A protein has these predicted regions:
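Non-catalytic, usually N-terminal nucleic-acid engagement modules in DNA/RNA processing proteins
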Residues: 2-122
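Signature of the catalytic double-stranded beta-helix
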Residues: 119-139
């Protein structure tokens, strides 16, 4: 069982570290002819409050199908109660590797092969990363 630290700062760093460590795993891989290489560079990880007014603004701008943190929490955990200010949203960005950016910058009509691979295999990794974050938070 993974022990989540009590202090907010420690918990933030613990979650960031869990995400970062997973990106160092073999799951973060592009199967290229030249061999496997990481699909993504080190992730950028951020947090926001569940009651951030931007979520309501997104809903107004995007449409009623956009779920606020409170709405998705209630749909996912119908028996649990949590106020919006008790929720934290975890977000991450998986930056393209320098080599992918370089290869793609040389292309004029179609994406570079490495970029196309990162689109497919990188998104597969992103799904696994989401599952991993859920797993460690539930432990």
């Amino acid at each position: 069982m993974v022990k989540i630290p009590n202090a907010t700062h420690d918990a933030v760093e613990w979650i960031r570290d869990c995400i970062h460590q997973y990106t160092l795993s073999g799951e973060n891989s592009l199967p290229l002819e030249s061999g496997h290489e990481p699909a993504w560079e080190a992730p950028l990880v951020g947090f926001s409050r569940g009651d951030d007014p931007l979520y309501q603004r997104f809903k107004e701008d995007i449409g009623p199908f956009f779920w606020t943190p409170s709405e998705i929490f209630a749909a996912t955990f119908p028996d649990a109660k949590a106020a919006a200010d008790e929720l934290t949203v975890i977000s991450w960005i998986l930056p393209q590797t320098e080599q992918t950016r370089l290869d793609n910058s040389k292309e004029k009509t179609l994406p570079a092969e490495r970029w196309a691979f990162s689109r497919k295999y990188g998104e597969d990794f992103n799904v696994k990363l989401r599952d991993q974050v859920v797993k460690v938070l539930r432990e």
